[in-house]
Amino acid sequence: MGQCVTKCKNPSSTLGSKNGERESSKPHKRSSSHKEEHMSICGKASGEILVNGTKKGDASLEASQPLAVGVDTKKKEQGVGAELSSLQRIEELFRRYKDEREDAILEEGMERFCDDLCVDPTEFRVLVLAWKFQAATMCKFTRREFFEGCKSINADGIESICSQFPGLLNEAKQEDKFKDLYRFTFQFGLDSEEGQRSLHREIAIALWKLVFTQNKPLILDQWLEFLTENPSGIKGISRDTWNMFLNFTQVIGPDLSNYSEDEAWPSLFDTFVEWEMERRKSEEKTDCIPCLGTDHQSRDEQT
């Protein structure tokens, strides 16, 4: 979906009490005789007079139970009805975008889905939505992923999904949640049908840019430039390298002074640090050349 950085490849049961159970729980209806009415009034005053063999307080409790059961049952029925209605709306939404042949939302349907959500398929919000839906593949939502995803964010329509975006973006800022999103992104970028175990370098670069939308590390631009120039000739990014880069951004300072090759970093990081330090030295030399030229010119003018 939004993460389509390259061309994409292609019941609830009702609850309720039985009528017989409801009827059996109802108290016997008292007659309106003068004697019972008098006992009721007296019982209210003394608190000890029995009505049908029961203390007044107990009788009141008994009388209230059928109402409580009825209200509780009604609430359950309303809850079940609301759940069924929500599932129906999710079903209608899914059918609006699903493929004609496959029971899933594919590339074309995903584009229409994003259009209706007013989001660009390549933006961070779409990646976050795919994360909450636990989508296994780019540009595809299976029926199960779509239904479980909608239920997980309490949404059953375009408007309700849109209303969840601010909260989802805030959730993705939490350290533990972002770590989960970050690791999900690697798996999401793989072509599961081809059994890929590493990300193509170009795909990895695009996904790194995307996943760090809200909290960009200071070293990210240099890292991506290194991968773009690709001096080491790598073709893919392994899961270990992907996961360790997040640790790298958290513990290694932007000046790289606390990086040590003796620690258990992927060898690609060693190459990157060496490349970056050489690049910085080269830039320093380049910056000094104009300064020297200006200095000589000033001396000539003084002479």
Curated annotation (Swiss-Prot):
Region annotated Disordered, chain positions: 1-40
Any one cellular-component term (Gene Ontology): cytoplasm
Membrane spanning residue stretches: none
Residue ranges occupied by any DCUN1 domain in the UniProt entry: 85-277
Keyword Nucleus: yes
Principal location listed in the UniProt entry: membrane
Highest taxon of source: Eukaryota
GO BP: any one term: regulation of cell cycle process
Pfam families found in the cross-reference section: Cullin_binding
Lipid-carrying residues in chain (N-myristoyl glycine): 2
MF-aspect GO terms: cullin family protein binding; ubiquitin conjugating enzyme binding; ubiquitin-like protein binding
Record carries keyword Secreted: no
PROSITE patterns in UniProt: DCUN1 (PS51229)
Location in the cell: Cell membrane; Cytoplasm; Nucleus; Cytoplasm, Perinuclear region
UniProt keyword terms in alphabetical order: Cell membrane, Cytoplasm, Lipoprotein, Membrane, Myristate, Nucleus
Subunit organization: May interact (via the DCUN1 domain) with unneddylated cullins.
UniProt comment concerning the protein's domains: The DCUN1 domain, also known as PONY domain, mediates the interaction with different cullins.
Purpose: Contributes to the neddylation of all cullins by transferring NEDD8 from N-terminally acetylated NEDD8-conjugating E2s enzyme to different cullin C-terminal domain-RBX complexes. At the cell membrane, can promote and as well inhibit cullins neddylation.
Name by which UniProt lists this protein: DCN1-like protein 3
Gene: dcun1d3
